[in-house]
Amino acid sequence: MAFKELTLNNFRCFKSTKIELSPGINFFYGKNGSGKTSLLEAIHLCSSGKSFKSSNLQALIAQGEDSFSLKSYDVDKGYILSVTKEKNKSISILVNNTKTTTSRLIREFPSTAIHNNTFSFADASPDFRRKILDRSLFVSDKSFLENWFAYYRCLKQRNSLLKSGSILNIEPWDIKISEEGEKLDLKREDFFKATLVELNILINTIKHSSSVNFLNDIIIDFFPGWDKSSELISIMTNNRFKDLKRRSTTEGPHKADIKFLIGDVDARQILSRGEQKLFSILWCCAQHEVLRKQHNINATLIIDDIKSELDTNTFDIFLELLNTLNNQIIFSCIDDHFSSKIESSFREFKKFHVEQLR
């Protein structure tokens, strides 16, 4: 999927704006408050039904207006997408004039957004890292959502029994949660391993290898949520009384995490903020490469305020990385760092001065 066009009506500071995007690299620049983040927010909303800035979509309606609308065109499948939000009404999502769900939106228009609240995956919560992994599985594996819901339904039932203070009827749920948990774990681990392969390929394409030594030092481990020297059913059975005391299920795929270490130390304690951000970008790109190569899915990478946290060295690595990627990339910055000479070296590059779009 690559967005070809985006039309904004009464969305934040944009009264009526139409943008033609490149299927490759798109760069938005302008001073603070010009609307850079709002444009990226609109693109993300078109691919998820959610804003990465506000949980209140009504706040996105331009001041003095009763609704906002976003329209976009997908170059790969020819889909016409319309997203509308009226005051005091639910969001309306149409694909080719047919009402659809946010689940289909995420699957048909996949994207990942990196912004100031999520720029470091190493510093994020385990829940956030699980969501990034699970979202890629959701868009690439039609059976994953069924597995995911089945596991979490079992988890809810088991936790309900634990909170009641009785484990007399817990055995059937131990069996069921273990069956569903093993399926969920297998899918996660397979995608994680594929992402590692693509990550190493991306790192090896960077010519200034001395500048990325820190990337080679990072050890990345997938923790399934329990000690896999034992089967999950054994963990559930052996943990019954401990879980009863804590009134919740203490181990399982709902506790899964991706851990980033240097030696035996958490990477966030060693890496600079710029190095953490660059690594997060690489990790997202690696996941997108798995989607593209193994599932023929082209996801869009959205990066707000690219220069924030990055120094000259890490920014130069990012520029080098751009030419190795095949998916659509949309990012913003306060200043224009791209001369005509640099622009000509990129594939399908488009640059937008945001003040001129309003």
Task: Please tell me what each predicted stretch does.
Residues 1-31, 168-300, 309, 313, ...:
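Conserved NTPase motor "head" modules and their coupling/switch loops across ABC/AAA+ ATPases, GTPases
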Residues 332-334:
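H-loop/switch region of ABC-family ATPase nucleotide-binding domains
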Residues 79, 120-209, 223:
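An accessory alpha-helical subdomain
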Residues 304-306:
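Walker B catalytic acidic pair
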Residues 352-358:
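Conserved P-loop NTPase catalytic core
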Residues 47-128, 137-140, 144, 200, ...:
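Nucleotide-state sensing region of NTPase/ATPase domains
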Residues 11, 15-94, 165, 169, ...:
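Conserved P-loop NTP-binding catalytic core
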Residues 1-2, 63-68, 85-90, 253-258, ...:
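A short, compositionally biased
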